[in-house]
A protein has these predicted regions:
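Helix-to-loop junction immediately C-terminal to a conserved catalytic motif
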Residues: 51
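Conserved ABC transporter NBD signature motif
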Residues: 58-66, 75
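Conserved ABC ATPase "signature" region
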Residues: 99, 114-132
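Conserved ABC ATPase signature
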Residues: 136-140, 144
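Catalytic Walker B motif of ABC-type/P-loop ATPase nucleotide-binding domains
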Residues: 161-165
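H-loop (His-switch) and adjacent beta-strand-loop-beta switch element
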Residues: 205-222
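ABC ATPase nucleotide-binding domains
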Residues: 232-253
Length: 253
């Protein structure tokens, strides 16, 4: 598969404290990569640099072009973002919040098109949000808000979707729905990069990227024995890895 997004020699700091140290990563078209690591490893920082939301040294390449050379509209249509906090405009209806995802495709003189409205309607239906369409975002629970904000990110229809802890406040049934959505996206060619704390969910990805102390330690497939050894070292736990129904799981020993 061709590489669509690259991080090359990324260095970044927060309040003059280094958070990324010579980070390198490649993300292939149509693959889901999950970033894991202990607290403070630099996971969210790397994701923000990939999205162009955090200044850094080094290069981020999107379709082989430097991210910094792209216009804000180009970045907004090519990279969809779902942050860790379920933030949004509380007074807006669910329909209008999801429609915000179409803004990068609109111009001030045309506004929302029939195509934009069709995209939003299809997302509301597929994500079982239709009955909430007129409810304001502020009336929803944290997990419900996160589902709506995921729909907003999907409305961008970007080739790359970046998500930071997207299911932290979502119950188990909707976690399964989220996983099915991610798998459907990758099957249609979308590149998905997510940060997750749940290691067994992370092992459902095509690639797992392990971080520690601001560095990318390893990027490998869930079946790779080198990844299993790396995860035990980084998390400082003895783990046993088993394949269950074509998926890998990690158990504490």
């Amino acid at each position: 598969m061709s590489t669509i997004l690259q991080a090359i020699g990324i260095h970044a700091a927060w309040d003059k404290v280094p958070v990324l140290l010579d980070a390198h990563a490649d993300f292939a078209q149509g693959q889901w990569t999950c970033i894991v690591g202990p607290n403070g490893a630099g996971k969210t920082s790397l994701l923000k640099v990939l999205a162009g939301l955090m200044p850094a040294q080094g290069e981020v390449l999107l379709h082989g072009q430097k991210l910094q050379s792209l216009s804000s509209r180009q970045r907004a249509t090519q990279l969809a973002w779902l942050g860790q906090q379920a933030s949004g405009s509380d007074d807006l209806s669910v329909f209008d919040v999801v429609m915000l995802g179409r803004l990068p495709h609109q111009t001030w003189w045309t506004g929302a098109t029939d195509e934009d409205r069709a995209v939003v309607e299809n997302l509301l239906a597929s994500m079982q949000l239709t009955e909430w369409r007129h409810r304001s975002l502020g009336t929803l629970s944290g997990g419900e808000r996160q589902r709506v904000l995921l729909a907003r990110a999907l409305a961008v229809q970007a080739p790359v979707l970046l998500m930071d802890e997207p299911i932290a406040n979502v119950d188990a049934p909707h976690q399964a729905d989220w996983l099915a959505t991610v798998q459907q996206l990758t099957q249609t060619g979308t590149t998905v990069v997510s940060v997750l704390h749940d290691l067994n969910l992370a092992l459902r990805a095509d690639q797992v990227l392990v971080m520690q102390a601001g560095r990318v330690v390893l990027q490998a497939a869930p079946s790779d024995p080198a990844l299993h050894a790396c995860l035990q070292q980084v998390f400082d736990h003895r783990l046993s890895f088993h394949q269950v129904q074509q998926h890998w799981v990690a158990l504490l020993v």
